[in-house]
Amino acid sequence: MSDPVIKIAHNLYRVPTMGSGINSFFITEADGSITLIDTGLKTAPKKLVAAIKYLKKDPSDIKRVLFTHSHDDHAGGAAKIIEIIGSPKVYAHEAEAQYLESGKNPPRDLTHLAGFFFRFTPEGKFNPIKVTDKLIDKQVLPIGGGLQVIHTPGHTPGHVSYLHQESKTLITGDSVFNFGFKIAWSLSAFCTNFNQSKETALKFLDLDFDTAAFTHGPHIQKGGKQKLKKFLT
């Protein structure tokens, strides 16, 4: 059995909640507090709690919950894990907060055939949560030695990626996936504006990072920027 957490840097961990197919992330602080990035599906809280205990921590040590965006594979476990934690601060981009607070998915891109076709399929649902702190592009949070917010809209209106400056790790969210054997775009069927998603991912080329971490797929410990650059260009 694989470990419930995978260390990326001394204070940054990847938490596979459905194998490497869906990941959350922990950032630990010297004061013992933890930041959680994305909460996975509704079934994920059990895995998140197990991961916390594996690190010899308590769920109440999670003081901040950050989101890349509001789809159910990122926010499905939010209400439950927040209930377990207590009253953490909850962060999302200012253009994404409305979806988290309503429990509704952002609109789909009907200009692409996949989005047009899938508009009739049921969307994953999640219980609404209260966003306490609204993020903006280029904001640097005092988390883990500096966590920069990169607004990468397109997958959703308020989709963000995060740059963990201390370890030079980019957390892409759903801007791009890593299937292990190749890097790929997110599925157009689940984007609000697929073309915009591809355009805003080019922001990654101007960032200083070596490790690339993905919500969907294993992280690339070394040479992550080079591999992303090859894909993006």
Language model features: what each stretch is:
Residues 2-55, 161-173, 178:
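Conserved beta-strand hairpin/beta-sheet module of binuclear metal-dependent hydrolase folds
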Residues 43-45, 53-133:
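Active-site HxH/HxHxD metal-binding segment of metal-dependent hydrolases
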Residues 47, 77, 224-227:
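Residues at alpha-helix caps and immediate loop-helix transition turns in enzyme cores, especially N-
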Residues 88, 221-233:
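Short acidic, glycine/proline-enriched helix-loop-strand junctions
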Residues 35, 66, 90, 169-171, ...:
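Residue-level marker for buried hydrophobic side chains located in beta-strands
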Residues 11, 27, 38, 48, ...:
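Divalent metal-coordination and catalytic microenvironments
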Residues 7, 41-43, 96-153, 192, 196-209, ...:
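Metallo-beta-lactamase
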